[in-house]
């Protein structure tokens, strides 16, 4: 079920890029991607704060990540504009598998931006919140492009690669997986 469009800003001040989350939002706008669907969570809260500060980005909060995936697919089919799916770590990312498959089979461009646990916890098996081994490898077969971003410095280049394929030569779903620490680092 889709909730009403949610304008995530209170003041219209431009984002001064300081964090990985702000770099993600700036990259979306640079490639004219201005709409998205998703659920705020502990692992992507910095991203939602950056979205809140960006009045030109329209976001719809949904009740389930699968709904976000289908909404982004339908958004493109009805408007011709790419939308983003914002998914949280672990189960949230995996709930997007069915809509990603639909987008893949119909060559519908959709961009999935998912999160992962903190980089310091990746190699552990200590039971971090929403820890799911090899999330990117699970999603990779259902996307045309899948990449893990491990540093805020990589965000602009990775977005440029994804956007070139997403908006041009290789339509279909694309996935960017960002470590939680990438959103928080300067």
What kind of region is each of these model predictions?
Residues 2-186:
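N-terminal alpha/beta PP-like core and its mobile active-site loop of ThDP/TPP-dependent enzymes
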């Amino acid at each position: 079920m889709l909730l009403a469009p949610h304008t995530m800003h209170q003041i219209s001040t431009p984002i001064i890029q300081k964090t990985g989350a702000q770099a993600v939002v700036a990259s979306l706008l640079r490639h004219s991607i201005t709409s998205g669907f998703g659920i705020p969570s502990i692992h992507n809260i910095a991203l939602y704060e950056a979205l809140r500060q960006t009045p030109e980005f329209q976001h719809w909060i949904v009740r389930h990540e699968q709904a976000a995936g289908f909404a982004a697919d339908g958004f493109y089919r009805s408007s011709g504009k790419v939308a983003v799916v914002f998914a949280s770590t672990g189960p949230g990312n995996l709930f997007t598998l069915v809509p990603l498959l639909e987008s893949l089979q119909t060559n519908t461009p959709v961009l999935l931006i998912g999160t992962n646990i903190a980089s310091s916890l990746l190699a552990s098996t200590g039971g971090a919140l929403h820890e799911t081994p090899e999330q990117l490898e699970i999603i990779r077969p259902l996307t045309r492009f899948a990449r893990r971003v491990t540093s805020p410095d990589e965000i602009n280049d990775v977005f440029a690669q994804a956007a070139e394929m997403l908006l041009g030569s290789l339509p279909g779903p694309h996935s960017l997986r960002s470590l939680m620490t990438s959103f928080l680092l300067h």
